[in-house]
Regions:
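Long, low-complexity, charged/polar intrinsically disordered regions in eukaryotic proteins
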Residues: 1-11
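Short, cationic-aromatic polyanion-contact patches
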Residues: 9-20, 34, 65-78
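Short helix-capping/hinge SLiMs at alpha-helix to coil transitions
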Residues: 14, 27-30
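Pre-recognition alpha-helix immediately N-terminal to the DNA-recognition helix
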Residues: 21-26
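Short acidic, hydrophobic short linear motifs in intrinsically disordered regions
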Residues: 32-41
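A short, conserved structural fragment
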Residues: 57-67
Length: 78
């Protein structure tokens, strides 16, 4: 699986909405984030966040390592 790099994210300015660029930059830095973490870091609404994530990232429904058995959406770069 190829990772998008930060140069690609910054150069593809016209192709991406600001919210999409922000999400990609956050994932480039952190490699993997859960929904609540992305919401907190990006300050985007849930709808804007999920719209930005739709085609750009790999989503999986996983057990959070620090959680008490609750499953959460986890996002990584595709």
């Amino acid at each position: 699986m190829e990772m998008k790099n930060i140069d690609f994210i910054l150069e593809s300015d016209e192709a991406l909405k600001p919210s999409e660029r922000l999400v990609l930059l956050l994932l480039e830095k952190h490699r993997m984030l859960y929904t609540n973490d992305l919401l907190a870091l990006s300050n985007l609404s849930y709808k804007t966040l999920t719209d930005a994530l739709t085609a750009l990232v790999l989503k999986s429904y996983v057990l959070k390592e620090t959680g008490k058995g609750r499953r959460q959406n986890c996002y990584r770069l595709v």
